[in-house]
Amino acid sequence: MIRFDSPNERSRNGNLLLIGARAPVPGACKTRLGAAIGMATAAALYRAFLVDLAARFTADPAWATRNYDVAWAYTPDVDFAAVLRGCGCAAPLSPVGFVLQEGEGWGARQANLLRWGDVHGYARTVLVASDAPHLSRDDVGQAFAALERRDVVIARSLDGGYSLVGMRGYHDILSGVPMSTSSAADALVARATSLGLRVGETAAIFDIDEVADLDLLIGTLEPDGAAAPATWAALHSLGLLPETAVRRTAG
């Protein structure tokens, strides 16, 4: 079920961005990362991811030029608006939706969310996870632009999976796709192609799933963390920045 703060201001050009997210509870989010740095530390870092994504996609004054609605696709079944407020997320400047994830497994939940967009009147639906605090508005804009010419769009992650998936209408492109494997993106493309669909790809977007991904994130955000300030501050306060970056931050 979806709720927008201002129901009469929905459906910007028929485009919907869904941001998949979890309540930032230790042991229930970023567990692979938490196995290396501690579950409480991983959850604290993930809270900062949510703050940065909310600032960029729901609380930025540039919203007036955006051509898509935004909704949080959340789990578990909690008051996710309250969760975001508790994380310190800025109040949205635009109508924001909330959609509960439903289904057994991430593949089924993705399919249900993408189907939801189609059933509720969106011509194009793009789904991203909340594992990349550096995800930019340009990344999302390129995905919607690709869907003007293609039926399906993906942005690959660096591990063989994908960080973004979108489609025009709804097609069963996720059946048989092995989630969280190094062949997930290739399998999705093969499945979509077998259905006669045109697939577009945008620039790869790396996720923060493993401790090694933190080095990529830090390198992307250096020198000052301006692209994701809450995440940069959390990396600093949690002791996850290398000493050279700490000195630059302090300076």
Question: Language-model segments: which ranges?
Answer:
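Conserved alpha/beta core of the MobA/IspD/sugar-nucleotide pyrophosphorylase nucleotidyltransferase superfamily
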Residues: 190-251
